[in-house]
Structure formats: C-alpha cells, structure tokens
Regions:
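A structural motif corresponding to the C-terminal end of an alpha-helix
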Residues: 14-25, 121-133, 168-176
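Gly/Pro-rich active-site loop or hairpin
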Residues: 61-133, 147-157
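C-terminal helical cap(s) of enzyme catalytic domains, especially alpha/beta-barrels
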Residues: 148-178
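Short, well-ordered coil/turn segments that N-cap beta-strands
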Residues: 20-25, 48-51, 77-79, 130-135, ...
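Active-site acidic/histidine proton-transfer and metal-coordination neighborhood
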Residues: 1-54, 156-157
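Conserved, mostly hydrophobic/aromatic
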Residues: 8, 26, 56, 81-83, ...
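Active-site beta-loop-alpha junctions enriched in small/polar residues
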Residues: 31-33, 58-60, 84-86, 110, ...
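A non-catalytic, amphipathic alpha-helix used as a structural packing/dimerization or gating element
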Residues: 7-14, 73, 122, 157, ...
Length: 180
C-alpha cells in the first residue's frame, strides 16, 4: 500500500544521507523475487525517493519493465549498469510460479548478450549517447549443479560470447560516432 511505499522510500532516502556523509552512494537493484520487481514497484520507488539505481536490464525486463522505457524514466538516477540478457520464453514458467528462479537459471533463462529479448545494443548505445560514464558489469547467471565444468565449457563460454557481442556493439557505436 501507499503507506508502506512511503515508509520504504523514506528509509532509502535516510540511508542515502548516511552513506553520502561517508562519501558513498547506494543503488537500488530491481530483482525478480523481491519487493522491487515489477514496473509499478520500480515506479513507486522512483516517485517517492531520490535513491540511485542499478540498471539491471535483465531483471527489469523479466519484471515487465522495458529497459528502454526505464532509461527514459530514470536516466539521471542510474548509478551503474548490469548488462544482462534474458529469454522471456524461459522466464515465463518462473513468473507463473511453475519453476523456481534456480530452475529458470538452470534452463538458460539468463543467456549470453544478444541471445535474449533485452534490446542490449539499443540500451547501451543510448547510455553512451547520453554521456553515461559509470560502470558496466557483465552479469552472467549460471547454475553449476554437477561439479566443475570441463575446460572450455560452462559459464565461461557464455561470458566469452557476451564479450564478443559487446565488442561488436562497441565497434558499431564507435563507427557511428566517427561518422557523425
């Protein structure tokens, strides 16, 4: 309810004052399975507090908030970015309560950059055009359940594919900047 959101936002702002006094800042991280998951949750915090945000593309998308829309709504509040792609078809059973988040991860819900439904290239390009100069963190969720993967297998493969994709985005963006 509104009273609970007002209280949560007031606490976030109070925490922000405390950390700012020590030369730090905080960033709220929207995440599947938490209090701040769906667009209405995110907007409740955006409207009621001044807290910074971890722009987690994958978790925003899985919660139903288009990352491009979030960027338009909260660009000036982004503290850092989690680069994360998601396949919404594999997230659907998790959202319906038919699978746990861990089962969704095991099934490949969070995939290498460019293999999912997040408009990664569009979002990164817009962040760069808008002058974002903070951290980008490549976040690749993996669920290793049967011991250590063989060399050249496991999450390393997905991370390398994501890096390759991000390099391609960077090359396109850089070429576009030089042409302008």
């Amino acid at each position: 309810d509104a009273t609970a959101w007002d209280h949560a936002a007031a606490m976030l702002d109070e925490i922000e004052e405390i950390v700012a006094a020590h030369g730090m800042s905080q960033a709220i991280h929207p995440h599947l399975g938490t209090m701040i998951e769906r667009p209405s949750d995110v907007k409740n915090v955006l409207e009621r507090s001044q807290v910074g945000w971890t722009f987690d593309m994958g978790h925003l998308m899985i919660g139903g908030y288009d990352p491009v829309e979030f960027l338009a709504d909260a660009r000036d509040r982004i503290a850092h970015v989690h680069l994360k792609d998601v396949r919404l078809d594999l997230a659907a059973p998790v959202l319906r309560g038919e699978q746990s988040i861990m089962q969704g991860v095991q099934n490949g819900m969070f995939c290498p950059m460019g293999d999912g439904d997040v408009p990664v290239a569009e979002v990164v390009s817009e962040l760069e055009r808008s002058g974002y100069d903070g951290w980008y963190v490549l976040e690749q969720d993996a669920a290793i359940t049967d011991g250590e993967p063989a060399p050249g297998e496991g999450p390393k493969v997905d991370v390398l594919r994501s890096i390759e994709y991000l390099r391609a985005i960077n090359a396109e963006f850089t070429a576009g900047q030089k042409a302008s």
